[in-house]
């Protein structure tokens, strides 16, 4: 599957619009970007092993770990990795859903959720409000 950078960017924007806005509006000083593949530093930081892929990465200090002196800092960064997301997607719908799922996963890290909690929430049936 191939996709232009512009089309990938549009899908990220749509996913941002479709995610619960209380979580999106709570993002403060966070850059959301994409790259084709993780660089060496990102791969090392994520513990990426040969044959594994990385869909996204949150780099920053989660809200739950920030103290009163947390000021004048560079933005946190959420990176989505286009080539990896394309590899696990089989059509346009699955591509969009994977972008949205990966974006939500990395935003959850911003809010301080660890992988166990994120996976628990992903498996839970949706609630009706």
What residues fall within each predicted segment?
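Active-site rim/adjacent substrate-binding subdomains
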Residues: 1-98, 110, 114-117, 125-129
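Short alpha-helical catalytic segment bearing the HExxH-like zincin motif
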Residues: 98-106
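Auxiliary alpha/beta "docking" domains used to position bulky ligands
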Residues: 122
């Amino acid at each position: 599957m191939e996709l232009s950078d512009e089309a990938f960017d549009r899908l990220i924007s749509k996913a941002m619009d479709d995610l619960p806005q209380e979580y999106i509006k709570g993002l403060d000083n966070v850059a959301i970007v994409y790259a084709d593949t993780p660089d060496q530093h990102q791969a090392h930081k994520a513990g990426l092993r040969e044959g594994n892929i990385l869909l996204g990465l949150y780099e920053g200090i989660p809200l739950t770990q920030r103290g009163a002196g947390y000021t004048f800092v560079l933005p946190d960064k959420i990176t989505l990795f286009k080539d990896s997301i394309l590899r696990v997607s089989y059509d346009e719908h699955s591509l969009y859903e994977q972008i949205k799922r990966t974006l939500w996963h990395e935003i959850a890290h911003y809010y301080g959720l660890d992988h166990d909690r994120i996976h628990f929430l992903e498996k839970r049936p949706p609630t009706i409000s």
